[in-house]
Design a protein with these regions (language model features):
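N-terminal glycine-rich phosphate-binding loop for ADP-containing cofactors
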Residues: 1-261
Length: 261
């Protein structure tokens, strides 16, 4: 029986465990692992095996959207401010340094290969060029002592001043609400895709996993609840969410087009 257990870092502080179920995983194996996670004081969610599972796929869209904004010429401090205003526990450029751009690059390369091997056409995210540039100039992560932020004796000090010149910061400044929505909607849309593809089998797991595992703002109720509970200028609920997603798609790219579901 194959079954995976995905803990979150730091393990002693993060309450969530993502249980990964294979095609032939027995109910008995699942029940035993579920009980084990409860016994060690963790909150489990169950997902079906796929590339990135659920949480890694979704948090990647949050980070990617922030990096895309940086590549568009948005001020780095404005991006961090938008992340904080949206309600995330860590702003996206800071989080990217922790996640490690070299790892993100490897994931993008593997994703491209997976899509192309399956006969599909890979559509690179605008964030990939930013990741490659940062690696090229030797600023891949906090681990290496240099990323989007500067580090002194391992401690984060300030945003690296060279970001402004490297990415021509200040040449673009979208509305703050657009910046906030790009982050929130990117994760919500990816969550819906996970539900559509059967990676997730319940919206409850989506909401619990997104809040407790990857820091989706708690006031939203979770990345699935955000869709049905969305409140915007065009109204309230799923129809309003879809309308706003289409607005974002028209301005920032097809990745914001909502699925038919």
């Amino acid at each position: 029986d194959f079954i995976g257990i995905h803990f979150f870092s730091p393990v002693d502080k993060m309450p969530l465990v993502e249980i990964i179920k294979g095609e032939k995983t027995s109910d008995e194996a699942l029940a035993r692992v579920f009980d084990y996670t409860l016994a060690i004081g963790k909150t489990p969610i169950v997902v079906n095996d796929s590339r990135g599972f659920f949480t890694s796929r979704v948090i990647g869209t949050f980070v990617n959207e922030a990096l895309a904004m940086l590549g568009e010429g948005v001020e780095p401090a404005s991006i961090e401010h938008a992340g904080s205003q949206a309600g995330y526990p860590a702003p996206p450029l800071q989080l990217s340094d922790e996640l490690n751009l070299e790892l993100m690059h490897k994931i993008a390369v593997a994703s491209r290969k997976g899509v192309e091997d399956a006969g599909g056409k890979y559509e690179p995210h605008p964030a990939e060029a930013v990741v490659e540039k940062m690696i090229e100039i030797g600023r891949p992560s906090r681990l290496k002592g240099a990323g989007f932020y500067e580090y002194v004796d391992g401690k984060r000090s300030q945003l690296w001043p060279g970001l402004r010149e490297t990415f021509k910061s200040g040449t673009s400044q979208p509305p703050l609400q657009d910046m906030i929505d790009r982050m929130l909607f990117a994760e919500a849309l990816e969550t819906q895709k996970c539900l559509d593809e059967g990676v997730l089998t319940s919206t409850a797991d989506a909401n619990i996993g997104s809040i407790m595992g990857i820091g989706y703002p708690p006031y939203t109720g979770g990345s699935a609840q955000f869709i049905v509970g969305y409140q915007g200028a065009g109204g309230v609920g799923k129809d309003a969410f879809v309308a706003r997603a289409k607005e974002l798609a028209a301005r920032y790219g097809d990745r914001f087009n909502p699925p038919k579901s």
